[in-house]
């Protein structure tokens, strides 16, 4: 069954973040879990207890875009040699001792928590896998709407839309339009949209949200 519209709202939901037992928030004391599905895979606590320092640093750098990734990785590994990191606030405390934050309102543990969560749940791989499936789901002129909350998610969406909406130059002797050849399945609509100041005032978590919209090209 074709869909007229597919909406992706990537990342954590507020109920997940505000549920202390899930272990996503550094502001709420809880067991260090971070799994979207806590019946599958390693918890953040289990992963942090065994991961090599070099791999941990790479995860924090690539998925958290943390400037002090080496410093944080070393602090975590050094701490765990004394005892396992059991809770969210315990991990946040370890990170806070080695990270200097210049951005107003940003907690020192923000980027590292994001990185570990993305790694534990394979979030970016999930996005890369699901986006191509939309091409078969959408009806002609159907809309793909994506809302991403950080640059890593948005980068994947942006690249996917660009790759599937590239204009193709046809030789002059080809007496057909691009739309008739079944090329470029998507058309990007408008520019990326960010939350207004009014919306951010009502929902501060929307401050980093970016929405992109594309339409499936109807074939003749």
Spans of model-derived segments:
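S-adenosyl-L-methionine-dependent methyltransferase catalytic core, i.e., the SAM/SAH-binding region
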Residues: 3-220
């Amino acid at each position: 069954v074709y869909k007229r519209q597919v909406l992706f709202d990537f990342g954590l939901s507020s109920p997940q973040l505000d549920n202390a037992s899930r272990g996503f928030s550094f502001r709420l004391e809880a067991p260090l879990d971070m799994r979207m599905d806590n019946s599958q895979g390693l918890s953040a606590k289990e992963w942090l207890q065994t991961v090599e320092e070099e791999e941990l640093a790479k995860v924090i750098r690539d998925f958290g875009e943390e400037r002090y990734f080496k410093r944080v990785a070393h602090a975590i590994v050094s701490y765990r040699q004394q005892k396992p990191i059991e809770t969210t606030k315990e991990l946040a405390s370890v990170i806070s001792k080695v990270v200097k934050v210049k951005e107003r309102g940003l907690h020192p543990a923000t980027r590292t928590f994001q990185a570990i969560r993305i790694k534990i749940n394979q979030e970016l791989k999930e996005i890369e896998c699901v986006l191509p499936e939309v091409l078969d789901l959408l009806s002609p002129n159907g809309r793909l709407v994506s809302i991403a909350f950080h640059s890593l998610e948005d980068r994947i969406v942006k690249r996917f839309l660009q790759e599937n909406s590239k204009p193709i130059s046809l030789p002059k002797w080809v007496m057909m339009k691009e739309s008739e050849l079944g090329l470029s399945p998507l058309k990007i609509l408008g520019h990326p949209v960010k939350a207004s100041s009014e919306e951010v005032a009502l929902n501060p978590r929307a401050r980093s949200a970016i929405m992109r919209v594309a339409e499936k090209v109807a074939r003749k």
